[in-house]
Amino acid sequence: MSRIGKMPIKVPLGIKVDINGNDVTVKGPKGTLSRSFRPEVTINREGDYLVVAPVGTDKATRAFFGLSRTLLDNMIVGVKDGFDKNLEIVGVGMRADKDGDKVVFKVGFSHSVTVAPPAGITLSVDGTTKVKVSGINKEDVGQMAAEIRSIRKPDHYMGKGIRYAGEYVRIKPGKAIGKGAK
């Protein structure tokens, strides 16, 4: 049995959870999230707690058991507090500018790259080198941050590019000069 899946989820005050079979809707101060869960798990409300239980004991059911509990917990945290991911731009002349709800990246290409956020995601720029992706759906926030990072991944020789805040980029040594045959 999954140790994560066995833990009950506390529903905080101000959060409304509607369970209709395997369809769950969570409403909170930040918004509303809905998700359909796999038939391998059942979701029940017991007082102030949500309990996820597996239907069988096969390998696939055990895998979806812990996953379903974590997805449900992320829905509750998202509508209560929201999620955000911070990105940093490293490199001379590389910058990001806000243009309405879009962000324009100038990261060393001959052209600038404009990124428009999908519904439910907000992009903000702090200074010219810090970008914050925020929203209530953890999957969407992470996906948007990954797409922005993929515009110009950090270079392993100089470290230039777009990286997650706090991400360590291992710098490779350059070519050794003066070695070999003369």
From Swiss-Prot:
| Domain of life, per lineage | Bacteria
An example Gene Ontology biological process: cytoplasmic translation
Name the InterPro entries on file.
Ribosomal_uL6-like, Ribosomal_uL6-like_a/b-dom_sf, Ribosomal_uL6_a/b-dom, Ribosomal_uL6_bac-type
Q: Matching SUPFAM superfamilies, A to Z? A: Ribosomal protein L6 (SSF56053)
Among Pfam families, the record links this protein to: Ribosomal_L6
Q: Which UniProt keywords apply?
A: Ribonucleoprotein, Ribosomal protein, RNA-binding, rRNA-binding
List the GO terms this entry assigns under cellular component, sorted alphabetically.
cytosolic large ribosomal subunit
**MF-aspect GO terms:** rRNA binding; structural constituent of ribosome
UniProt lists the family membership as follows:
Belongs to the universal ribosomal protein uL6 family.
NCBIfam families from the UniProt entry: L6_bact
This protein's assembly is summarised as:
Part of the 50S ribosomal subunit.
Stated role: This protein binds to the 23S rRNA, and is important in its secondary structure. It is located near the subunit interface in the base of the L7/L12 stalk, and near the tRNA binding site of the peptidyltransferase center.
Q: What is this protein called?
A: Large ribosomal subunit protein uL6
Q: Which organism is it from?
A: Dehalococcoides mccartyi (strain ATCC BAA-2100 / JCM 16839 / KCTC 5957 / BAV1)
Task: List the lineage, top down.
Answer: Bacteria, Bacillati, Chloroflexota, Dehalococcoidia, Dehalococcoidales
